[in-house]
Amino acid sequence: MEECKQISILDVANRLGISFKQVSSSVYEHPEHDSFRIFSTTNTFKWFSRDIQGDVIDFVRLVKGISFKEALAFLSEEPFQKEAIQEKRERPFYYPLKRVEDSNCSLTRYYLTECRGISEEIIQKMIQQGLIAQASWKTNETVEPVNVFKSFDHRHKLQAASLQGIYKNHSLPRERLKTILKGSHGHVGISFDIGKPNRLVFCESFIDLMSYYELHQQNLFDVRLVSMEGLKRSVVAYQTLRLIAEENQKLEFLDTVIPSKLLPLMNTIRDTTSYFDNHPDLLTLAVDCDDAGKDFSDKLS
């Protein structure tokens, strides 16, 4: 399988009758879908508008509409070119707001209790785990207090942070500031453990996560609640692989996986093992029942 992954995805595309056009030194664009791109340095593709990505095996499966084993057979039978893959490593996340955090979190507590209906008990748990902070954020010449929601990885290293304004600003489309700090690693998600997790519940936002906990806390045991900060299959893949690595005491495995490989790895486990069949309650999606939520659920099924 590893040998198949070395096959040039551009060569495969050409053999399948798709002539991707070069738009930069290492990026190629589908002739009919400008959000469908191949990255020659990593030998991967991503279809941005459909949130589909992967390696050359996933590419063959998508284009030909065949199974994992059939894709491997196709790549093994044909004499394709090999590609020298340069793995792209992300830069470490830098959190610039530590000096302007307010340890009291009084405004954050007020917003979450009075505006979002979250209990003080749950807020305190999140603060104690370091998932919530209050800080000052400067936009142009304006400084305002913001809620900070923090994302930690399997080594409890800070990898991302989302900001939300506490006060309304009617000049903004959503009335409150919402942004993700530059350099955040969005594939990790924000996670909160209850007991010793053996299953995962995914929510769209951290406030959704707290609301879910508020509603279901009496029935939540040995579970990890995860905010995807959107609808991100990469977060589902990372947290699933994390749980499997924890079960097998092999967290060092996750230290070496680059984000673009997370979803293909999860798909490989799905297609080549019985793990998901043996753990039917592993994943729960607690997302909005709108078109986006339904589409996201369909892509994962």
Question: Where are these predicted regions, by residue range?
Answer:
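Short active-site loop/helix that positions an aromatic residue
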Residues: 62, 209-218
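Short active-site oxyanion
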Residues: 196-200, 282-284
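Short, catalytically relevant binding-site loops at active-site mouths
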Residues: 168, 207-209, 231-234
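TOPRIM fold recognition
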Residues: 1-2, 45-54, 216-301
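Intrinsically disordered, low-complexity linkers and terminal tails enriched in Pro/Gly
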Residues: 78-92
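N-terminal structured subdomain of primase-like DNA metabolism proteins
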Residues: 1-82
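Basic, glycine-enriched DNA-binding surface that flanks or lies within the catalytic cores of DNA
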Residues: 90-194, 218
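Terminal peptide-recognition signature
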Residues: 47, 60, 112, 149, ...
